[in-house]
Every structure is written in C-alpha cells, then in structure tokens.
Design a protein with these regions (language model features):
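Short active-site neighborhood of thiol/selenol oxidoreductases, capturing the structured segment around
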Residues: 42-60
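Thiol/disulfide oxidoreductase modules built on the thioredoxin-like
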Residues: 99-104, 109-155
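N-terminal signal peptide c-region/cleavage motif recognized by signal peptidases
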Residues: 15-17
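Structural microenvironment flanking redox-active thiols in thiol-disulfide oxidoreductases
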Residues: 63-101, 112-117
Length: 163
C-alpha cells in the first residue's frame, strides 16, 4: 500500500497541534517558585485580578512591554502579577537581566520542556493571561499588550459577569 507524502504531511498538520498545545483550563492553577525563592500560588490571589505574563530575555516585544506592565500592576491595588520566564537558560542570566530591567512583580523561570499544566504552551511570546478575581481566564493575549488592553479586558469581563 502506498501512502503519499502529502497525505502524511496532512495527517501531521492535523495531529501535531493537538499533541503540542494543550487547552488552558477555565480556572487554571499555578504554583511556582519565584527567582527570589518565594512561592507564587495563583489560588492565593482569588479576589484580585492577576496578570500572568510569559516572556523571555531574548524577546524584544516582551522587554518593550515590561515597564508599562510593571507600572500597571504597581498602581492597582486590585491587580497582582507573575512573570514566567519561558526560556532554557541559566537562572542567574535571568536574575542578571532583571537587575538592569527591574519589574514590580515576581518572576519565575518555567521549564520549557515541562510548562505549567493548566496553561496552554505559548505559541509565541509574549503571551499574557488576565485572570479574573474568581480565578477564571478573562482574556488571553498573544503579542505585546498595553495598559489600555488590560483595562478594556477587565471592563469587558466585569460587564459580562454583571459586576
């Protein structure tokens, strides 16, 4: 029996995304050790908005959005955040990078071969999730974001929930 190359390629294209990318859970969990040795537990942030931001030191759009993202999180009492350094590099390199580009939210290094189970594998960086106070994903962003994007997503989620 002959199997055409096009047929095999077509089958791979249909199957590969299901194998590589998982769905993000409706109410994801996340418990990671931050670079400063503390534990960040998303479940402990219920009642607040949480910005979960996948980034990397080599990602120019990630670096460009960091100051505005940091200022947004620092300015809002109802918002916290976590930066997930999604790269295969030495932990100290990330710490050194952050020494020159500090942020006002904790950072954890994520193993690219074993990322958090409740979040889909990022298809690009930066990837940002806005988690609502009830723990649900209010919005997922692929690419750089601005403060206005987060504010708009928060307003949309609030109006959808009747708050």
């Amino acid at each position: 029996m002959k199997i055409s190359l096009a047929g095999l390629l077509g089958m791979f294209v249909l199957v590969a995304p299901a194998c590589v990318l998982a769905e993000t859970a409706a109410k994801p969990t996340l418990k990671v050790e931050t670079l400063d040795g503390k534990t960040f537990d998303l479940a402990e942030k219920r009642g607040q908005w949480v910005v979960v931001n996948y980034w990397a030191t080599w990602c120019a759009p990630c670096i460009a959005e960091m100051p505005e993202l940091s200022a947004f999180i620092k300015a809002r009492k109802d918002v916290s955040g976590i930066g997930l350094a999604y790269e295969d590099t030495d932990r100290q390199e990330i710490i050194d990078f952050l020494a020159t580009r500090p942020v006002d939210y904790p950072i954890a290094q994520i193993d690219v071969d074993d990322p958090p189970a409740d979040f889909a594998t990022p298809r690009g960086l930066p990837t940002t999730y806005l988690i609502a106070p009830d723990g649900s994903v209010a919005k997922q962003f692929l690419g750089p974001i601005k403060e206005k994007d987060l504010e708009q997503a928060m307003a949309t989620a609030k109006s959808a929930s009747g708050n």
